[in-house]
Regions:
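Short, Lys/Arg-enriched N-terminal segment that forms or immediately precedes the first helix
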Residues: 1-7
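Nucleic-acid-binding surface
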Residues: 11-31, 35, 41, 46, ...
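Glycine-centered, phosphate/nucleic-acid-interacting loop/turn motifs that mediate DNA/RNA or nucleotide
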Residues: 49
Length: 208
């Protein structure tokens, strides 16, 4: 390689690092290419150890602090149209003692099923306001994470009580009362959207 080629490669490398830093140090392959990083530069950075592979097709600048929650970061990056829900959302909001063995993700009906080697995920199909309402965006390890609010998550858990377990639902209500400012109006609004208003009302009256 000539001195000029080496200089050009170094310039492309530095530009790629700057692009990664602009995006919090983590990018999907498609994002990196759209941002102007040449495929050869991307794979050279990977092979030289300048990038760590978080998951297939997800790269992160090497040398950064360990990810606080690599599973959520991977899903947020690989499934940007999804919303973290149910047990995973309860765990994020500290409303359960359950340790999720899969990342629970809501998708709009008709969306393509994600293909991830890791982490394992469980998808749920939500429609209309049941999908769009109650979504919060949090920054985690410099990545935007879409996740349902505590109140929307409780309503979802009542709706999917046969899947998450009713003991988990009751525990979540109790933790919500103890650890959060109770927003009854929001709870009932999301319960109406999820069509569990009649089911949730007596538990709210008893526990809240």
């Amino acid at each position: 390689m000539s001195r000029q080629d080496t200089k050009n490669q170094g310039s492309r490398f530095d530009r790629a690092v700057a692009i990664f830093k602009k995006h919090g140090g983590i990018l999907r392959t498609a994002q990196a290419l759209r941002a102007g990083i040449h495929p050869t530069t991307l794979y050279t950075m990977r092979d030289s150890g300048a990038l760590d592979m978080v998951s297939r097709g997800v790269y992160r600048l090497a040398g950064k602090s360990p990810l606080g929650d690599p599973d959520l970061v991977t899903v947020a990056t690989r499934v940007p149209g999804g919303v973290i829900c149910l047990i995973s959302a309860l765990a994020f909001h500290e409303l359960t003692t359950q340790i999720p063995h899969e990342v629970h993700v809501a998708l709009p009906r008709g969306a393509e099923e994600p293909r991830l080697d890791h982490p394992p995920i469980r998808t749920y199909r939500f429609t209309g306001e049941a999908f769009t309402q109650g979504v919060e965006t949090h920054r985690i390890d410099s990545v935007s994470l879409r996740i349902y609010s505590p109140e929307k998550t409780l309503a979802d858990c009542f709706k999917f009580r046969n899947k998450v377990g009713f003991d988990t639902v009751v525990e979540a209500i109790r933790f919500y009362r103890e650890r959060r400012s109770v927003k009854v109006d929001d709870l009932m609004r999301y319960a109406a959207i999820c069509r569990v208003k009649k089911i949730i009302r007596p538990y709210l009256e008893a526990l809240l």
